[in-house]
């Protein structure tokens, strides 16, 4: 630890250590101020510091003022105090010399060493006055000093910025002397385990708290130093322990990767130096100046924890250090967490994507069949798996609904032909077209078979519709409240006839051509049967039900055309009944999918043909 003290002291005196201290103090000060422990430390420091209280007050003003002169003066006074100290004077004076050079070199380093010196001065002076008594108190303060010096380093970082520079220098200077003195005091404490150990415990507790407040690196290093320092100080002879402890602390500081490592080393030195009660007191007071110092200074002196408490406090210190490390990691973790949040944001982005996917799924659910067939965009928006699953489930639901509607619509003779045509045409469009045609004249009979066939055809379309959904990119433009049901027919048509929007264009453009191909509704039904090209066939069938009007309207929207022709047709009432059934069922589904529901409702309100309604219902069920 001697090497540590020596090494640590020069670094403390050196600017780099001061810089490190600065960083550490910034971090430490925040934590210290944030922590509940500062008040405890302050109380202990105030009570235990008694003798060093006056010096502490001066140190506070100096540190608070952030005057390098005050730091130098405190260093000189500490040196004088070191001279007063028995054998500690030499190390503390040497430290003072180092501190003086450091203070001259860097104000920040000066503040750091001044803190160390301040810690050392009371130690030296008090050691001269009452070596053993203060040894107990010093050990309190010594442990306190270790932690408080750690605190000083933390505050010194702040003080370096503001006023800590003056106090840092003495602490760095005092390190060796304070270590020796603190070790001596600890040994002296051994006779006075109760008072000294409690003080040490108080120091340990304070230091641990301070360490918690301090940078994680400093805290982690200091805790081992505080725990090891206390144990080592009390266990090892004063001459050996200060060096060994300093080396160990130095090693710990070296181990610390943080820029505060030098600070930690200096803080450790200061902490070791701070083993002497005086050392601890001034640092605590500067902390009070920072707002942490006041709490830290009174606590160690005022509260004399039993020796057992010192052990417990050491444990607490380590726990605190661990927590501080976690906090620092949290700071890093804060970043990491922020990154995670960003990732979460990204994940939420992913989630959002999935949510849009879900929303899109909602849309696909709205149009799962329609979307897959109608708009590849929607299908693209919705996960393929979801679409497939929903499509299959909805197809099953649709098949049941269609069967129910078919049972209501009744009649399957003409529909028997339709199943073939629907199967050939993939049934849904043929079924819907036939339904429209049948509603024109075959409404109920084809509806039953058409529903079954539509279910079959749609089931086929589910499989085919998904690949067709790629074509749905063109369809993505088509989706509209009115176009939804038509799109569902067209969806089916697209999967059947073509994989591209061309089929839809054909549906819009070619439907006029198709109607001549299937003038009779039955012929139209046969057309879908014979013709796999559903867009044209479907359009023809849709047109056929309302023959003339649909032909003109088809280009506008098959759904509307189908619905208008159906409404115009005598089967409008049937379509309305079917539509109402579909509406009830689809509305059940609509509850889940407002858009699809709205579209379906619009279709039903417009009196879309039973086929259109069924198509919408199937689409809605598929969507749902």
Curated annotation (Swiss-Prot):
Residues 1-308, 342-596 are annotated as: Disordered. Residues 535-549 have a biased composition (Polar residues). It holds the Pfam family AMER. GO terms for cellular component: plasma membrane. InterPro entries: AMER. Residues 406-416 have a biased composition (Gly residues). One of its GO terms (molecular function) is phosphatidylinositol-4,5-bisphosphate binding. This is APC membrane recruitment protein 2. It comes from Gallus gallus (Chicken).
